[in-house]
Structure formats: C-alpha cells, structure tokens
C-alpha cells in the first residue's frame, strides 16, 4: 500500500498521514509488490508513477491520477508501454517538459535489458567494465506514456570515462534529478556500498560528471531519497532503520537540510551508520 504524508513545516511540524492512496488490489494488471513511487503535477492533476511486478513477475511502470496530492489515486488499466525496472523519479524542467529517471539492478531487474529489449541471459558487468547505467525518458504531454525510447544515463569520472561496475560510487538504483543554478544534479543510491552520490550535467539527458557523496551510510540498507526546495531552503529526504534496530525492511522517514558550497558542490551529510 502507498500512503501520503504532509506537513507545512519540514523540520519541526506535525506530520499528517492521509491513509492508503493506492494498493495492489486497485490495479488491473497487478501481479505483486508495489515498490518506490513518485508523483508529478501538471495542469491541475497529480500523476503517480509506480513500479509493480506484472502477472509474469516482470516489473512495469504504472500511472495513477488524482485531483489532489493526498489522493486517492486512480490507476490506468495498463502499464506504460515500453516500461521496465523500478524507481521512477519525474523531473519537470523550466520549459515544462517532464522526464522520468528510472532503473535499479539486482532485484530491480535492470540487468535483464539491453537497448530497451529483454535479453535471454542477463548478467552484471565485471568490476573492470562500465557500470550499468540508469535510464531517462521524456514523457508525453498527457503524462501517460513515454514520448521516446529510454536512453542510458551516463555517469563519468573526471577523465570522461564511465564509472566502472566495481567503483563504490557507481549507480545502483533510486535516481533523482534536481536543478540548481542552471545545472542538472543527478543523484542516486549505490546500493550495496550504501552511499547517496551525485553527478552534474548541462541538460536532462547528460552525460553527468561524478562529483561526490551526498550522504554517508545510514543504519540499515535504505538510502532511497528525494531532494526538494521548500520555502527557500533545500532538503534531503531519505530513510534509515534506527527505530527498528537496523532491520532493513522496517524503514523510517528522515529529513535533513541540504547545503551547497560557493562552487555549487553539495556538502556531504553524515548518515550516522558505520
């Protein structure tokens, strides 16, 4: 089930739980497992993008629509054409165009695809090979389908080479995009190495040059996140497992103010883990 929380004071305000806004039983093409979702706004409507396994146990992206941010959200009858993997994050650029960033390896099934087509014998690259990239795709004006074929999101080192699969700062899952001082900040989770990292580019498609760590490891393996500007300040939303004693399936929402230095670099935040 998905819930919506709201507050008007990010650091100190009361949190309101608006209850269940979408559940598996509501979705016609459902198999099982709703994973991390995102919501975008356009023309008075709220569009929730969610990954879910279909009846063949393959992840697809779905869309559900509401007139209000607190829901309820009504799902479309079919998944988005050409969609796969997990962790959709939708970014609205200054010209009103919307882009979805998505993908996750291991259980997120990204390794099952090459050039947007399923392959018969999926495998992960060797440590000395380029890491599997996430994906980005422009959305159609109606927000319900892809406007084009998804593209690879390249994260490059200082020499212009793709980060290797054995690099602890390579992409794993949980893409996010925000814009600061005219630059595009791609952030993501490194999964099994437990960092939130970021890279900067000049346009929504990249390529993006690796910059550093946003958040050091937290308690538990749970570093999905969002970066949001609200009332003139920037915030990092993430989660950890402190209240559950480190049980990774029992996650608690966290927020911390995010700051930049004079050059636009994000100041690293201590996650409090090992």
Protein language model features and the residues they cover:
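Carbohydrate-active catalytic/glycan-binding domains of CAZyme proteins
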Residues: 1-274
